[in-house]
């Protein structure tokens, strides 16, 4: 697996995160150092490697300030498998809900997809060539061979009445005639020139055996997956366009061209050495009243999570995986509880603490304009597809930021997510009318913003429901 991104210096990682995330420099620095330490560990001898584990991170801050986005972008920068889970979805072993080991199995699934996608990209040209050959044969088929019933050694005992069920000649063809060869040559040329992309062709695709009803509980999920793998995959015929058929066939051939066992082993190692698990809402399982029944259950979840953070061997459908060197990032607002309300053993497993700042008006302005594909740029691009040009003035952007900040103060503080609701509401009429106003130019000014939002933003009751 190509993990060139892990060789980035902390400054380079922070620089890449700055392309997408505004502010929160302390959090960016700490995750960048954690990533760099992984690279440093990879350069050590085997004995030293085993002694050094990642320093897990606890992010503390209100919703919408960038906790998840920092972790997600960080994983993307280095090509590491990443999953986000919510601590509240887990329950103690023996209760209804997801068991904590499922987060590791989910991470391995992500890792397998990453590794196989990269390996498939290396054989893509060969797989596409095979797919094109198959398409030519499908578009200009030869005569099918008749099923052979003459070579069964038992037929002489039964007067030739026993057909040979052991052979399936369904897909075998007679040798192509000269006429068919000529037609195929012409079709191949047209395929290469892209002239047949919209033509329809019938192909056989594997049908997912589906879930087994009797194994629907989470505890039996792995058993269900194993059963699905053992069950024969039924093939069904579909009529699709040539361009779609090529993708389906190429993907199937790419699967055949890569070594599945080797890919699975590589994925397990990648998950072990580079995996990142983001545990959100960890504050919701913190306990500040140790007498209530609910808090006893929350403590149980914490104690179930603890062995995975300390290092456990988890069985997955691809093999066993050790969690000792995975990086865990816990996150929560900690409005009601405090990090010290977590059980002491779990607190000790998150040695790096970082507090994320609440967002100011200036932060909102930067979020609207600075990232690589900021919200303003996204809406401009979407409306441009309808040939409607939208221009936001600097004053209008500042006004939007002020309204978002004020609504957060007056109602629930949902951080940068408030900008999505504000922009959607402000541009609702324009988005609806855009198809009927081609070549229009719309200037978004402070007056435009106030006309669309002021009556709502100044009414706290309306803000709570609409924005």
Swiss-Prot record:
Bias (Basic and acidic residues): 178-192
Cysteine pairings via disulfide bonds: none
Gene Ontology terms describing biological process: protein unfolding; proteolysis involved in protein catabolic process
Compartments reported by the entry: Cytoplasm
Pfam families referenced in this protein's UniProt entry, alphabetically: AAA, AAA_2, ClpB_D2-small
Source organism superkingdom: Bacteria
Protein name: ATP-dependent protease ATPase subunit HslU
Species whose genome carries this gene: Staphylococcus aureus (strain NCTC 8325 / PS 47)
């Amino acid at each position: 697996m190509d993990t060139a991104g892990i060789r980035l210096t902390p400054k380079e990682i922070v620089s890449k995160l700055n392309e997408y995330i505004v502010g929160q420099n302390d959090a960016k620095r700490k995750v960048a150092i954690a990533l760099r330490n992984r690279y440093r560990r990879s350069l050590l001898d085997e004995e030293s490697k085993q002694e050094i584990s990642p320093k897990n991170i606890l992010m503390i801050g209100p919703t919408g300030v960038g906790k998840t986005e920092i972790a997600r972008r960080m994983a993307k920068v280095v090509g590491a498998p990443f999953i986000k889970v919510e601590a509240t979805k887990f329950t103690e072993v023996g209760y209804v809900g997801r068991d904590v080991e499922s987060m590791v199995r989910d991470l391995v699934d992500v890792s397998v997809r990453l590794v196989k996608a990269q390996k498939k990209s290396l054989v893509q040209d060969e797989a596409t060539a095979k797919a094109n050959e198959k398409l030519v044969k499908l578009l200009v088929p030869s005569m099918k061979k008749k099923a052979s019933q003459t070579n069964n050694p038992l037929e002489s005992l039964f007067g030739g009445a026993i057909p040979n069920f052991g052979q399936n000649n369904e897909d075998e063809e007679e040798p192509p005639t000269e006429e068919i060869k000529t037609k195929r040559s012409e079709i191949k040329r047209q395929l290469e020139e892209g002239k047949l992309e919209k033509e329809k062709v019938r192909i056989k695709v594997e049908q997912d055996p589906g879930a087994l009803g009797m194994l629907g509980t989470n505890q039996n999920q792995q058993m269900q997956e194993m059963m699905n793998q053992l069950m024969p995959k039924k093939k069904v015929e579909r009529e699709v366009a040539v361009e779609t058929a090529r993708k389906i066939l190429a993907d199937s051939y790419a699967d055949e061209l890569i070594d599945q066992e080797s890919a699975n082993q590589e994925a397990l190692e990648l998950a072990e050495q580079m995996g990142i698990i983001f545990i959100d809402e960890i504050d919701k399982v913190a306990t500040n009243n140790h007498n209530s029944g609910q808090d006893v259950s929350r403590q149980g979840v914490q104690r179930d999570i603890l062995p995975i953070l300390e290092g456990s061997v988890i069985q997955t459908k691809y093999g066993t995986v050790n969690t000792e060197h995975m990086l865990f990032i816990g996150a929560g607002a900690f409005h009601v509880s405090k990090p010290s309300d977590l059980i002491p053993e779990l607190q000790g497993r998150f040695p790096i603490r970082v507090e994320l700042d609440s967002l100011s008006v200036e932060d909102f302005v930067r979020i609207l304009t600075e990232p690589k594909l900021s919200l303003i740029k996204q809406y401009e691009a979407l409306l441009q597809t309808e040939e409607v040009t939208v221009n936001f003035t600097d004053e209008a952007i500042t006004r939007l930021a002020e309204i978002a900040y004020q609504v957060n103060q007056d109602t629930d503080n949902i951080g940068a997510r408030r900008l999505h609701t504000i922009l959607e509401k402000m541009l609702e009429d324009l988005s609806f009318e855009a198809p009927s106003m081609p070549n229009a130019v719309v200037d978004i000014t402070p007056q435009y913003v106030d006309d669309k939002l002021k009556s709502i933003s100044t009414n706290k009751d309306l803000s709570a429901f609409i924005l």
